[in-house]
Regions:
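Conserved helicase ATPase core of P-loop NTP-dependent helicases/translocases
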Residues: 118, 131-143, 283-310
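Interdomain "pre-motor" coupling segment immediately N-terminal to P-loop NTPase/helicase cores
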Residues: 1-45
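N-terminal pre-P-loop "Q-motif" helix
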Residues: 54-77
């Protein structure tokens, strides 16, 4: 037996009901019986031969990466775009998007997290004002077809055999990474090529590159040409960490800069927010927060000085002149990939390409050490020649 959706072949994950077997592994995406064929979804296909509208011209490095990506895709190869945070991964996809749309092909953009889906959709609307863009995620399922579809990886179950180009952002992010069901659904949604974006590709992805199954394009230079922010690691007790968080948030506020304070658990965020609110305007966002979008809008509009958050906001959110402090950085929830993404929030703006990233911890574990090493290595790859 084999499930035609998630490719499950484990007998223990099939159930028997009224004379038929069905798959329990992907039951969350509706019941699918064994031997039941999945029909291709019918979507609009528009031929569009236009160009994206950008606020700035791509750098020479971005143009080269963009060209290489489209060249590999045009040759029928899947591509991993390994680019540092803030390098402009989304914009580098635009040449490929235009190339596929010019041929009347269907383009989809899938991301693990709902917040990032909304942000990417906004950026695509700005770059492609002549095209219809729809976001498909929790709370946004009324419209499921447009010239370009942006959805969570969970929502890809709606699109079997749909996309000639499927762009998978945050390849290494929860819940997509390591999830066999979501990965199988993504593979089924793509009838052409996959363009996979990551600042922290995992070992399996890099193995596909070594085995020549996937092409690799790298870009570690940000458009403003300033180095990535290497975090300052401070090893102190939890009590002193709290005092440093308060001090740094007040200091940044006086400099008219906002702060993201990352905590490992909701309960850490709850009491830390209460303490910080005594000194600066502070709010809290985590997975159970009901009004996430409203709080994020307030932070973007500078109505808040500090936003305490869990790793929910480690990716996708872009705030000019934001500073980052990680509290209890040696907690297991802060993996190397997570920390690289978190400190990648700093220094993304052309107007303020510098900033501070501070990792507070009781001791520097391997994740912290690897984070510092990998960010430094990316900088060395780009700027080593200028240091000599």
């Amino acid at each position: 037996m084999k499930c035609n959706r998630c490719q499950n072949e484990d007998p223990k994950l099939f159930a028997y009901d009224h004379g038929v077997y069905y798959c329990r592994k992907c039951i969350d995406f509706s019941r699918l019986e064994v031997n039941e064929k999945i029909k291709p979804v019918k979507l609009m296909h528009k031929t569009w031969k236009g160009k994206p509208k950008l606020d700035y011209e791509l750098t020479a490095s971005q143009k080269l990466a963009s060209h290489d990506v489209y060249k590999h895709l045009s040759n029928g190869k899947d591509v991993i775009l390994y680019a540092s945070t803030g390098a402009g991964k989304t914009e580098i996809c635009f040449e490929s998007i235009c190339g596929y749309l010019a041929q009347g092909k269907k383009v989809g953009f899938a991301i693990s997290r709902r917040q990032v889906v909304l942000e990417i959709a906004t950026r695509l609307r700005k770059a492609f004002p002549e095209l219809s863009i729809c976001e498909v995620a929790q709370g946004y399922t009324q419209i499921t077809d447009a010239d370009i579809i942006v959805c969570t990886t969970h929502q890809l179950y709606r699109y079997p055999y749909a996309f000639d180009l499927l762009i998978l952002d945050e390849l290494d992010a929860f819940p997509f990474a390591g999830n066999e069901v979501l990965q199988a659904i993504a593979n089924q949604a793509c009838v052409g090529q996959k363009l996979m974006l990551s600042a922290t590709p995992d070992e399996e992805s890099m193995r596909f590159v070594e085995e020549k199954k996937t092409e690799l394009v790298c870009l570690f230079e940000r458009p403003h040409k300033h180095p990535l922010i290497v975090p300052k690691v401070i090893q102190v007790s939890v009590f002193l960490q709290v005092l440093i968080v308060i001090y740094e948030c007040i200091k940044f506020c006086r400099d008219n800069k906002q702060t993201l304070v990352f905590v490992p658990r909701k309960r850490d965020g709850t009491w830390l927010k209460m303490i910080l609110n005594l000194f600066v305007k502070t709010s809290l966002v985590h997975s159970s927060t009901e009004n996430k979008d409203e709080i994020l809008d307030c932070f973007r509009n500078k109505e808040l000085d500090v936003l305490v958050c869990t790793t929910l906001l480690e990716r996708g959110i872009t705030i000019p002149s934001v500073q980052v402090v990680v509290f209890k950085g040696n907690h297991s929830v802060f993996t190397t990939a997570s920390l690289i993404q978190i400190f990648g929030r700093v220094g993304r703006s052309f107007k303020d390409p510098k900033g501070e990233g501070i990792c507070l911890c009781q001791f520097s574990n391997q994740s912290i050490k690897d984070c510092v090493y990998q960010i430094s290595k990316m900088n060395d790859t780009v700027y080593a020649a200028t240091k000599k």
